[in-house]
């Protein structure tokens, strides 16, 4: 739609406008008219980049500044409002790649508030229209994902669509069916509902996002800028199998339409409760009903402080009038409902200087440029370096050493450069020169035709070797406790562990020579290494670090082979018959086994007694024998009842109350104060759900249990 030259013009115009729009209220009519035309032009461009391409080129905060400036101009001079103004309609995200469907009710945007004063002004308008002295609001986190509309008819999921232009969305039903948190059946009929349309967001957890970007960079693919882009780009994949690989989740937040109409719940909070009870993932437990605007503001401030600890990226809070009957009284504009507003958190951005660019070598040889910054505080964290991803990213943004840059940090996501302040250039800035040789081993670097990254292909590259050992020892692979980064580097630099096979030939005297190790810690490390010999086959496959082979792929491969050695001779076609394994992955596996050094490492592992074959499981009933478990709070892996069944299946005891005989209290989300207090009183060890899962994951199929647990009918109490 936009040529590269036109994009460059519009991006430059955006920068100019952001400098101009400090106070639009003092503009004359002619000045306002010209500025409004320019604002509409750049806003349409940024709508296209955000909604259609899922590749925004400016931060949300800057977009909102442009949009608010246009609204202020049109408020001062209503005669400047045009029918096609972005303020009069929802931005379109229709790409033309999927069939379109009409929403049952318009899927509008939300108006934004950036301060307490603006929230109070919203409350004043609501009270004025409704005639109420105090309004009850439902306040919930604002997820930063990709909007979807789900339709259920006669209890069955029949359609899923993107937001589109608000009236029509793109039909992505098959893609959404791969997302496990979307029930294919939900018993709305229990509430007399024959047809329901639900609104939600497709999101990706922050830890999954980090993992996804790491894999993409190792594969030579461009990383996603943020979790929202990852979610939006993923649901538009043409192959549902590709969507299924992304570990997406759908969280629903709104019941938008029901038939027959009289089955509609009276409040927003009650509708969330119903959806939660029917098996949808919702924001029900994070939603608070507030009496009046003061409580709303207090709750928003509370969440702004703890936003980083939330597993999903959130950029604010949504404030809705709780009584759904008042929604009709308050009505809508063509852009947003008048009964809701989004309170946006302050952006975590800062301006600093890029003082240098260094190059790091990844586990699979990918060369990543890292920008060194003059230290700057972002959201309570001091940032001194930033990933520059790859050569294309640097060229696209025209990043130079010595530039002043705008850096943004979103949650746990690695800080990144959102803009170069070219107007601050002095002429002394230097272009970034990419190396021709590996900074670790000196080998000539290569760039494969299908990749954006440059890569070192030397199997003996020191930097890659250290990272391969680190990956092997990681929690999801061989889980060697006590073998941290610093220890791995020391072992490698002293020639004690040049590859993962060498770990299993270490002696006590070797480890005692390392700084920081006494006899006890050295013995503990040797014990952890010894214990890792018995990990299941899929974790061994994942730990080998074969390019493109993640945890899911490793599990699928482990199901069709008896030993790692089977992969040496397995036909390419047989591998490609596995779901989710195409030619690229299969070829990478075959290439791994064609490298003599890799075969030598496998022989070392086998000789040391590392399990390279399907594990004959020990009698699982003995694993938790003699241990009593109590659970508190909500678990992600399964219900507390199901967790208790697992404990008993593995030989342990399950109890509902904490006593002096309890061994472990497993703490989930929103734990009960009584159980925590008793655990402290009796000296009972408290562990997280993650620690509990690590105890049992080698002996039970948690994915299967989770699915079976969801199929069980929930107990439905009185909701309305």
UniProtKB/Swiss-Prot annotation:
Manganese or magnesium. Has higher activity with manganese. GO terms for biological process: DNA repair; DNA replication. The keyword Ligase applies. DNA ligase that catalyzes the formation of phosphodiester linkages between 5'-phosphoryl and 3'-hydroxyl groups in double-stranded DNA using NAD as a coenzyme and as the energy source for the reaction. It is essential for DNA replication and repair of damaged DNA. Residues 220-239 are annotated as: Disordered. It catalyses: NAD(+) + (deoxyribonucleotide)n-3'-hydroxyl + 5'-phospho-(deoxyribonucleotide)m = (deoxyribonucleotide)n+m + AMP + beta-nicotinamide D-nucleotide. The active site is at 142 (n6-amp-lysine intermediate). It holds the Pfam family DNA_ligase_ZBD. NAD(+) binds at residues 60-64, 109-110, 140, 163, 201, 320, 344. CDD domains: BRCT_DNA_ligase_like, LIGANc. Belongs to the NAD-dependent DNA ligase family. LigA subfamily. It comes from Aquifex aeolicus (strain VF5). The gene is ligA. It is an enzyme of class 6 (ligase). The keyword Iron-sulfur does not apply. Its cofactor is Mn(2+); Mg(2+). Zn(2+) binds at residues 438, 441, 456, 461. Disulfide bonds: none annotated. Its EC number is 6.5.1.2. Transmembrane segments: none annotated. GO terms for cellular component: cytosol. NCBIfam families: dnlj, PRK07956.1. InterPro entries: BRCT_dom, BRCT_dom_sf, DisA/LigA_HHH, DNA_ligase, DNA_ligase_AS, DNA_ligase_CS, DNAligase_adenylation, DNAligase_N. Keywords: DNA damage, DNA repair, DNA replication, Ligase, Magnesium, Manganese, Metal-binding, NAD, Zinc. This is DNA ligase. Residues 619-709 form the BRCT domain. GO terms for molecular function: DNA binding; DNA ligase (NAD+) activity; metal ion binding.
